[in-house]
Design a protein with these regions (language model features):
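Acidic, metal/ion-coordinating pockets
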Residues: 29-323, 403, 408-411, 579-580
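Feature captures C-terminal
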Residues: 35-40, 50-54, 59-64, 144-152, ...
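A short C-terminal boundary segment appended to hydrolase-like catalytic domains
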Residues: 295-440, 589-612
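C-terminal low-complexity, Ser/Thr- and acidic/Pro-rich disordered "stalk" regions positioned immediately N-terminal
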Residues: 607-649
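C-terminal membrane-anchoring or membrane-association module
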Residues: 657-676
Length: 676
C-alpha cells in the first residue's frame, strides 16, 4: 500500500517539540477539557474537462472553473484543509481529451495554493488506458502532486494508491492570557470506484486491471488508517448510488461522491451504525462543495497531548454549495472585488491561458480532407443548421436530390460504427452543432460538430425497439417540419425569424430527432406515424432489419437515457463505454478514404411509396371474364372502392330501382299471407 507524504506537513525543526506530544511550555492559560474545531474539505466531481470561469448574468448560471475555484478558495476565512475530487475529471471537453487529460492534471496540481490533494477515477477517466490514468500525477510540475486513489483496483503493470494521510496543525488561544495551545488532527483519505462501473469499460483499456468490491476495500483501508492514528476518515468514491453505497461502509466519517451528477447532501447510517455525511456537487464545474466536519479534541485537562482523543460528529457536519453566481458576487464586491479579480486574472493568465494557447494550436491540426460538403444547415457558416438537422435533413431536397439526407448525421453515425463495430448507430439533433465543408478538415472543425464531451456507448436492443424509436423520431421531425414551414412563410411575409419562432414554436423535444446509421432506409412521408419506414436493410450484410433480433447500437451517452421520448430504450442493455464522440469523428476523418468508408457504414435514406405485397408465387390463374353478347357493365360499389357508385347511367338506375321495388312487394305479400 503506497502512502503519500501529507501535503502542508510542517517540516521546520523549530516546531518539532510542539507537535510530537511534548508539553506546550509556552502555554500559561486555563486549558479547557475539550476544544471544538472542524475539518474543512472543498470538493468537486464530474467536471468532465470543464476548466475556466464563465458567468451569464441574465441566466444566473455558469462554470466555476479552476480560476473561479481559486477565488472561492481564497474567500474562506481559513483556507480549506483538503481539496478533493471524486472522478470523471480528465475526460470530456476537447480541452481535456486532446491532451489525454494532462491539461486538467496540470491545472489540478498548480492552479492555486497547493492544488488538489487527491482524486479517484471515474468511469470516463479510463478512456486513455489504465496505465496513463494511474500515472496521471506524472504530469505534475511540483514536488507534491495530487494523489490518484483507487483502493479496489489492481493492475499487473503497477500499484494503485489506496489512501493518503494529512496532518492538520491546530492552535487554541486563551482569550484572557492569549496563550496558545498547539495540537494536531490527522485525516485519512481513501478512494475507490464502484466495481460495477468497471464492467462497462473497454476491455483493451483496462487489460491487466481488475476491480474488487469497492466497499470492502474502503472498509479495510479505513480500518488501517484508524490504526495509524487518523482521527477523521474521508472517502472519495465514484459510485452508482452514493447513499446506498454509504450504508455498506465502516469507519468512514464522510463520503464525497461522484457519477450521479446531482447535488447531494444527506446523512446516512453506515454499516457500523455511525453517521456518514454523503455529499456530491453536481457536474461540469457548475458547483463546488465545502464540507465542514466538526470534532471535539479532548485535552484531558493537561498540556500533554500523549493521551488526548478526538471525537468526530459527522451528524452535525455542514455542507455548502458554491456556483459561478457566488464567484460573480465576490468579483463585484465593492470592498474586496478587486482583490478577487486579481486572483482570477492571475490564475487565468498564468495557468489557464498557456494551456488554452496550446489547445488552440492543436485545434488547427489538419486531420484529413473532404471532397464534398457535409453541412450543418445551408452552408459552411451553419445557417439554419439548428433547424435543418431537425427537419429538412430527413426529407428530399428541393432540387430532388435524395442522396444527401442527414449528411452530417451520417458522418457522425459512421464514425461511431467505425469505432465500435456496432450494427446500428444513432445521434440526436441536439448533440450536433457544426458541419464539414469541402477541403481540409481540422481538429477544430470536428470539435465544433460535437462540443459537449459526450461519450460513445454500445447498447443491445431489438430491431423492433430500434424501429419504434426511429418512427417516433420521424414523428417529432414531421411536427418540427410543419413549424419550420410556417416560420419560413411568416418570415417571407416580412417578419423576423425570432418573431416567426415565437409565433410557431418548436416542440420541446425537438433535439431528440435522431440521425441514424448502419441501415439503408426508405421513408414514406405520406404514411402515418409508426408506418413511415417502409424498408430497412443493414449495411453490414444487406439483410432486412429483423424486429425480433438483437442488435448492437452505438450512441452517445446522453440520448440513450431519454426513455421519455423513446420508451423502448428502457429495454436496452448497456455494454461498453468508448471514447468521446468528438474523438470518434477525429479518428474516422484521419483515415485515408474515410468518406467511402463512412458512406458504406452509414447507409442511405431514400424516399418513396409504401411497399406493396409482392405477387404470390406461383401466381394464381385469373378467372375468365364473363362473356356476353353485349358490352359487360362493371358495377362499382362502395364496398369495393370505399366510394359511392358513379351515377351516370340513368336507364340502369331506373331498372335497378324497379327490380328492387318488385322484390320488396313480393316479400311483404308473403309475410302478410303467413300472418293471416
Amino acid at each position: 500500500m503506497k502512502r503519500f507524504v501529507p501535503r502542508l506537513a510542517l517540516t521546520a525543526a523549530l516546531l518539532a517539540g510542539v507537535f510530537t506530544g511534548a508539553p506546550n511550555l509556552a502555554f500559561a492559560g486555563n486549558l479547557p477539557a475539550a476544544i471544538d474545531g472542524s475539518v474543512a474539505i472543498m470538493h468537486t466531481n464530474d467536471i468532465h474537462g470543464s476548466y475556466k470561469y464563465s458567468y451569464n448574468e441574465s441566466k444566473g448560471t455558469g462554470t466555476v472553473g479552476f480560476d473561479g475555484l481559486a477565488v472561492l478558495y481564497s474567500a474562506q476565512g481559513n483556507a480549506p484543509d483538503l481539496l478533493l475530487d471524486a472522478g470523471d475529471t480528465f475526460h470530456g471537453q476537447s480541452f481535456a481529451t486532446m491532451s489525454e487529460g494532462k491539461s486538467i492534471a496540470e491545472l489540478m496540481d498548480t492552479f492555486y495554493a497547493d492544488g488538489y490533494d487527491a482524486t479517484t477515477p471515474g468511469n470516463h477517466d479510463w478512456s486513455y488506458g489504465a496505465d496513463k490514468l494511474r500515472t496521471m500525477t506524472g504530469s505534475s510540475t511540483t514536488s507534491t502532486p495530487f494523489a490518484m486513489l483507487c483502493a479496489n483496483a489492481k493492475s499487473t503493470s503497477g500499484v494503485w494508491s489506496s489512501s493518503i494521510t494529512k496532518t492538520l496543525n491546530r492552535t487554541w488561544e486563551d482569550s484572557e492570557s492569549h496563550s496558545t495551545f498547539a495540537y494536531q488532527i490527522k485525516v485519512g483519505v481513501v478512494g475507490a470506484m464502484d466495481e460495477s462501473l468497471g464492467s462497462s469499460l473497454r476491455a483493451d483499456l483496462v487489460a491487466g486491471t481488475s476491480f474488487s468490491s469497492a466497499a470492502d476495500a474502503i472498509n479495510a483501508e479505513a480500518e488501517q488508517l484508524r490504526k495509524e492514528g487518523c482521527d477523521v476518515v474521508v472517502c472519495i468514491a465514484h459510485t452508482l448510488d452514493a447513499k446506498t453505497f454509504a450504508t455498506r461502509l465502516r469507519g468512514v466519517d464522510a463520503l464525497i461522491a461522484g457519477h450521479e451528477h446531482i447535488n447531494l447532501n444527506e446523512k446516512v447510517t453506515g454499516a457500523d451504525g455511525k453517521t456518514i455525511h454523503v455529499v456530491e456537487a453536481g457536474s461540469a464545474f457548475a458547483e463546488v462543495g465545502l464540507l465542514s466536519v466538526p470534532y471535539e479534541y479532548d485535552t484531558k485537562g493537561t498540556e500533554s497531548t500523549d493521551d488526548d482523543t478526538v471525537a468526530v460528529y459527522a451528524g452535525k457536519s455542514d455542507e455548502k454549495l458554491y456556483t459561478a453566481k457566488d464567484v460573480n458576487v465576490l468579483l463585484t464586491d465593492p470592498n474586496k472585488g478587486s482583490t478577487y479579480q486579481s486572483i482570477l486574472d492571475e490564475v487565468h493568465d498564468n495557468k489557464i491561458k498557456p494551456l488554452d494557447d496550446a489547445f488552440s494550436a492543436a485545434s488547427s491540426e489538419v486531420l484529413g480532407t473532404s471532397s464534398t460538403n457535409y453541412f450543418y444547415g445551408e452552408n459552411a457558416s451553419g445557417t439554419h443548421g439548428w433547424e435543418m438537422v431537425r427537419t429538412t435533413d430527413f426529407r428530399p431536397s428541393k432540387e430532388g436530390d435524395t442522396t444527401k439526407a442527414q449528411t452530417i448525421g451520417h458522418v457522425i453515425c459512421g464514425s461511431y460504427l467505425d469505432l465500435t463495430g456496432a450494427d446500428l448507430a444513432i445521434e440526436n439533433a441536439g448533440g450536433i452543432r457544426g458541419g464539414i465543408a469541402a477541403g481540409d478538415v481540422t481538429a477544430g472543425n470536428v470539435i465544433a460538430i460535437s462540443p459537449y464531451g459526450n461519450t460513445v456507448e454500445t447498447w443491445t436492443m431489438t430491431g423492433e425497439d430500434f424501429l419504434a424509436a426511429l418512427e417516433h423520431s420521424l414523428q417529432i421531425s414531421d411536427e418540427c417540419n410543419h413549424s419550420y414551414e410556417l416560420q419560413q412563410a411568416y418570415v417571407a411575409a416580412g417578419h423576423t425569424e425570432q418573431e416567426a419562432q415565437d409565433k410557431y414554436k418548436w416542440r420541446n423535444d425537438s433535439g431528440s430527432v435522431l440521425s441514424f446509421g448502419g441501415i439503408n432506409v426508405t421513408i414514406d412521408w405520406t404514411q402515418p406515424e409508426s408506418k413511415r419506414i417502409v424498408s430497412a436493410t443493414l449495411t453490414k450484410d444487406g439483410t432486412a432489419l429483423d424486429p425480433a433480433k438483437d442488435y448492437t447500437v452505438a450512441t452517445n451517452n446522453y440520448i440513450i437515457t431519454n426513455t421519455t421520448d423513446f420508451p423502448t430504450f428502457a429495454n436496452a442493455t448497456k455494454h461498453t463505454e468508448w471514447s468521446t464522440c468528438e474523438s470518434a469523428i477525429r479518428a474516422l476523418i484521419g483515415q485515408n478514404g474515410w468518406e467511402n468508408k463512412m458512406a458504406s457504414l452509414a447507409g442511405t435514406i431514400s424516399f418513396g411509396s409504401a411497399a406493396v405485397d409482392p405477387t404470390p408465387t406461383p401466381a394464381p390463374t385469373p378467372e375468365p371474364s364473363p362473356k356476353t353478347d353485349a358490352t359487360t357493365t362493371k358495377v362499382i360499389t362502395k364496398k369495393t372502392t370505399g366510394k359511392l357508385a358513379a351515377t351516370g347511367d340513368r336507364t340502369l338506375a331506373v331498372i335497378g330501382a324497379c327490380l328492387i321495388g318488385g322484390i320488396v312487394i313480393i316479400i311483404l305479400g308473403i309475410i302478410w299471407k303467413r300472418r293471416r
